[in-house]
Amino acid sequence: MGITSLLLGLTFVLNIALAISIIFLERKDPTSSWAWVMVLLFIPILGFFLYLIFGKPISNRKIFSWDKKSRLGVKTTVQSQLRLLEENQFEFNQPDLIEHKDLVYLHLKNDEAIYTQNNGVDIFTDGQTKFDALLEDIEKAKKHIHIQYYIMRSDGLGNRLADMLIKKVNEGVEVRVLYDDMGSRSLKNSYIKRLKRAGVMVEAFFPSRFIVNFKINYRNHRKLAIIDGYIGYLGGFNVGDEYLGINKKFGYWRDTHLRVIGDAVQSMQTRFILDWNQASRDTILYNEDYYQTVSAGNVGMQIVTSGPDSEYEQIKNGYIKMIMEANDYICIQTPYFIPDESLRDALKIAVLSGVHVKIMIPNKPDHPFVYWATLSYCGDLIQAGAEIFIYQNGFLHAKTIIVDGRIASVGTANIDVRSFRLNFEVNGFLYDSEVVNRLQNEFDADLEKSTQMTRKLYDQRSIGIRFKESISRLISPVL
């Protein structure tokens, strides 16, 4: 027997073992499971390595560690809020929010997401104003600055941020920067070294330590900034010149980001600390300076996170619950729309129940297969009666859901399998009609810059586009 035959035989045996593991042990979504089984069967050698790199699930063992004091504090608050909700004694500062107590309960039970209602919220839809505000807050920092982004670039904006962080370190402010190793793969080593030499603590999430990174498919997609424990930022903007709208390929960059002052920032801080402690040997312990109580409004909020290590798909479950609670309308903005069957059915049921569903997607792809799959799934919703709008004023990157003008979600999670099952994500769920109406006004303004994809237009698409959609939809479970 030749070496080639031996290797082929060994690969066949290993692929059969992997296929059995995928079907019986890993408890993947059936569609995803069969997609990987087909890859292993039809391209056995390449498929074997593709699965090891992109398909192997992360350990169910929690990869994030809490110090006992922080853990006890969160647990105590969560149990107290759950009990009050169960006994109908929870006091919402806006009485009509009692109608959404089940959503609050879900996030408490599902993610230990504490409900806070003393928050002030600013909304940014433009990168220039968002980063001007962030840099101004950083410049005023007195104690600490915690920065976390999926993508960081060593370009004009990246260097402006670096200059400001170095300035604050020289003033005695503690500065930590956490970036995703894959998302920030273009970040220059000289940029990182410059920060470290100045005293900025810098860490990469799931870095490539070997030739093959077996965690490459599991990325930290979160974008957080916490300043002095009471100002927090979260949303869709990363750090790079394209997010300022000066990239010729994408043009204007339309995103949504929140600036929060209030107790919700404590949950954002905890999330940063957990992520930092996973990535760094320099473990952050409980520090009262990290958790400041400042009231700046009466906006109700829960900071909800999810990831491949989660037992449940917390953010996706929150999306579905919001859709289920809708009585009048649902407005969605997402750059990628590849819903799994559960979310797709929830939207169809809402439409067929008389709820007006509007979904806005970009008019240009940054990931072609994802874009064509998005169009395919939008076609399903068009047939059910949803309205699909194509944003024409640049690139739409916002991840926003608005329901009935009363509740909303803004964050990093797209409506796709990657965000629900493979990426570490963070969203803010908002319970406040005034803030939600501000988000609604932004959505309505975007409608003026969009064109509707009607049933007639969708049915007129070319054979080439139909072919691209079919292929992209077929592989969408592994995108």
From Swiss-Prot:
<dbReference type="Pfam" id="PF13091">
    <property type="entry name" value="PLDc_2"/>
</dbReference>
<feature type="transmembrane region" description="Helical">
    <location>
        <begin position="5"/>
        <end position="25"/>
    </location>
</feature>
<keyword id="KW-0472">Membrane</keyword>
<keyword id="KW-0812">Transmembrane</keyword>
<feature type="transmembrane region" description="Helical">
    <location>
        <begin position="34"/>
        <end position="54"/>
    </location>
</feature>
<protein>
    <recommendedName>
        <fullName>Cardiolipin synthase</fullName>
        <ecNumber>2.7.8.-</ecNumber>
    </recommendedName>
</protein>
<feature type="domain" description="PLD phosphodiesterase 2">
    <location>
        <begin position="392"/>
        <end position="419"/>
    </location>
</feature>
<keyword id="KW-0443">Lipid metabolism</keyword>
<keyword id="KW-1208">Phospholipid metabolism</keyword>
<dbReference type="InterPro" id="IPR022924">
    <property type="entry name" value="Cardiolipin_synthase"/>
</dbReference>
<keyword id="KW-0594">Phospholipid biosynthesis</keyword>
<comment type="function">
    <text>Catalyzes the reversible phosphatidyl group transfer from one phosphatidylglycerol molecule to another to form cardiolipin (CL) (diphosphatidylglycerol) and glycerol.</text>
</comment>
<keyword id="KW-0444">Lipid biosynthesis</keyword>
<feature type="active site">
    <location>
        <position position="228"/>
    </location>
</feature>
<keyword id="KW-0808">Transferase</keyword>
<feature type="active site">
    <location>
        <position position="397"/>
    </location>
</feature>
<feature type="active site">
    <location>
        <position position="223"/>
    </location>
</feature>
<dbReference type="InterPro" id="IPR025202">
    <property type="entry name" value="PLD-like_dom"/>
</dbReference>
<keyword id="KW-1133">Transmembrane helix</keyword>
<dbReference type="InterPro" id="IPR030874">
    <property type="entry name" value="Cardiolipin_synth_Firmi"/>
</dbReference>
<dbReference type="GO" id="GO:0032049">
    <property type="term" value="P:cardiolipin biosynthetic process"/>
</dbReference>
<dbReference type="InterPro" id="IPR001736">
    <property type="entry name" value="PLipase_D/transphosphatidylase"/>
</dbReference>
<feature type="active site">
    <location>
        <position position="404"/>
    </location>
</feature>
<keyword id="KW-0677">Repeat</keyword>
<comment type="similarity">
    <text>Belongs to the phospholipase D family. Cardiolipin synthase subfamily.</text>
</comment>
<dbReference type="GO" id="GO:0005886">
    <property type="term" value="C:plasma membrane"/>
</dbReference>
<dbReference type="Pfam" id="PF13396">
    <property type="entry name" value="PLDc_N"/>
</dbReference>
<dbReference type="InterPro" id="IPR027379">
    <property type="entry name" value="CLS_N"/>
</dbReference>
<dbReference type="GO" id="GO:0008808">
    <property type="term" value="F:cardiolipin synthase activity"/>
</dbReference>
<feature type="active site">
    <location>
        <position position="399"/>
    </location>
</feature>
<feature type="active site">
    <location>
        <position position="221"/>
    </location>
</feature>
<feature type="domain" description="PLD phosphodiesterase 1">
    <location>
        <begin position="216"/>
        <end position="243"/>
    </location>
</feature>
<keyword id="KW-1003">Cell membrane</keyword>
